[in-house]
UniProtKB/Swiss-Prot annotation:
Predominant subcellular localization, coarse grouping: cytoplasm
Keyword Nucleotide-binding (UniProt): no
PANTHER family assigned: TRANSCRIPTIONAL REGULATORY PROTEIN YEBC-RELATED, TRANSLATIONAL ACTIVATOR OF CYTOCHROME C OXIDASE 1
Any one GO biological process: regulation of DNA-templated transcription
Gene3D superfamilies, A to Z: 1.10.10.200, 3.30.70.980
Pfam families reported in the protein's UniProt record: TACO1_YebC_N (PF20772), Transcrip_reg (PF01709)
Family: Belongs to the TACO1 family.
Localization annotation: Cytoplasm
Protein name per Swiss-Prot or TrEMBL: Probable transcriptional regulatory protein PTH_1024
Length: 243
């Protein structure tokens, strides 16, 4: 992985999880359930729910699954009571790690996550130990291949729509926004015919640490193991591995 591009991480992960579509559906359903429980079942007045539904549709989750998840969140249907938790810790080489969890059994999940850290050369930390190294941002990714309009026009369009920053990566453009502006900027880009590869609220690292050798290999294994855990929704880390 070169740099700390979120999109390079997403692409690396995509091939691995494509064969686990059932797990993807489950994770997206949990996000919808929690979003509906916290902000109600109307996506027009619940920004988080609207974003979760969009991600589910992009992953080809059937509409009936989406509706059931909303109804579970609002209490119209019964189901597990999922709790949203953020875990923080350190990986090999001192890399900072944040994990978004949705679980119906906090104690079980905490033990399993702690074991994953220990097995891969890291340690689960206290709340707040690394959160200060990250900033919550809206993240929009546009792939360079076949991208319209050109880079300068896309940057101007994004910034005029309210984006905070625009960055050209090796094979993509990454646009960051305030979390509350994500849908507005996304709508402006899509309205101009821009094809969006990813749009989500993410924890963006403010600084990164370079890893190599054994530390790089162990960090990769740690992130993979965390992402494979059923209760993990997202993993964020501030490391980079040079190609």
């Amino acid at each position: 992985m070169s740099g700390h591009s979120k999109w390079s991480t997403i692409k690396r992960k995509k091939a691995k999880v494509d064969a686990q579509r059932g797990k993807i559906f489950t994770r997206l359903a949990r996000e919808i359930i929690v979003a509906a429980r916290q902000g109600g079942g109307d996506p027009e007045s619940n920004v988080r729910l609207k974003a979760a539904i969009q991600r589910a549709k992009e992953a080809n989750v059937p509409n009936e699954n989406i509706m059931r998840a909303i109804q579970k969140g609002t209490g119209e249907l019964g189901g597990a009571n999922y709790e949203e938790i953020i875990y923080e810790g350190y990986g090999p080489g001192g890399a900072a790690v944040m994990i978004e969890i949705m679980t119906d059994n906090r104690n079980r999940t905490a033990g399993e996550i702690r074991h994953i850290f220990a097995r891969n050369g890291g340690s689960l930390g206290e709340t707040g130990c690394v959160a200060w190294m990250f900033e919550e941002k809206g993240l929009i990714v546009v792939e360079k291949k076949g991208s319209e309009p050109d880079e300068d026009s896309l940057m101007l369009l994004a910034l005029e729509a309210g984006a905070d920053d625009f960055k050209a990566e090796e094979d993509s453009y990454e646009i960051t926004t305030a979390p509350g502006d994500l849908q507005k900027v996304r709508g402006a880009l899509e309205g101009a015919g821009v094809k969006i590869a990813l749009a989500e609220v993410a924890m963006i690292p403010q600084t990164t640490v370079k890893l190599e050798g054994d530390d790089a290999e162990r960090m990769t294994r740690l992130v993979d193991a965390l992402e494979e855990h059923d209760d993990v929704q997202n993993v964020y880390a501030n490391y980079e591995i040079e190609d």
